Amino acid sequence: LPAKIGGELAGVYSMRDLADADAMADEFQEGRRTLIIGGGYIGLEAAAVATKKGVNVTLVEMADRILQRVAAPQTSDYFRAAHTAQGVDIREGVGLDHLIECDGRVGSAKLSDGSEIEIDFAIVGVGILPASELAEAAGITEENGIKVDEFGRTSAPNVYAAGDCASLPYKG
């Protein structure tokens, strides 16, 4: 998270590995408030752990729905219902504008919809956007990433894509 929007404040954590999870463990106390930025699997898992520890969770996802890049709408619906049933406030189509300092650490967050919420800590679990510029320049079909079939084949002969840049077909 860039420093100009509060990423350097105490109480702001990025979630990439187990060491990151360990670094924020003391924040998970009953009655505290957190903002989770990102509605992918990382953000949703952080929300599940936080609510089990009694933390009040607001989760923002800039996309129109949680898990938009990685799952079918039905999967998003399932996880949304499961998390909201546990008290998670999920706000889709809403991102973070900036974090606000209070007494030397994060104290509130201004969101892209103009609302402001008080928080005790923030978790950044935004993942990455697919790097598909080369495919685009080559005229390869893109659909939420580089479109591939079940074998990883793209629209170009003898060109394959895999990993976060690939968009796999949904076979409901």
Which residues fall in each region the model found?
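Hydrophobic/aromatic beta-strand patches that form the interior of the parallel beta-sheet core
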Residues: 13, 58-60, 91, 123, ...
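A conserved FAD-binding loop/helix module that cradles the flavin
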Residues: 148, 162-172
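FAD-binding core/adjacent interface of flavoenzyme oxidoreductases
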Residues: 1-35, 108-116, 121-126, 130, ...
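Rossmann-like dinucleotide-binding cores of NAD(P)H-dependent redox enzymes
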Residues: 33, 41-100
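Short, well-ordered coil/turn residues at beta-beta hairpins
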Residues: 125-126, 137-138, 158, 162-165
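FAD-binding beta-loop-beta segment adjacent to the flavin cofactor pocket
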Residues: 149-160
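Conserved phosphate-binding and hydrolysis motifs of nucleotide-dependent enzymes
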Residues: 38-43, 114, 120, 163
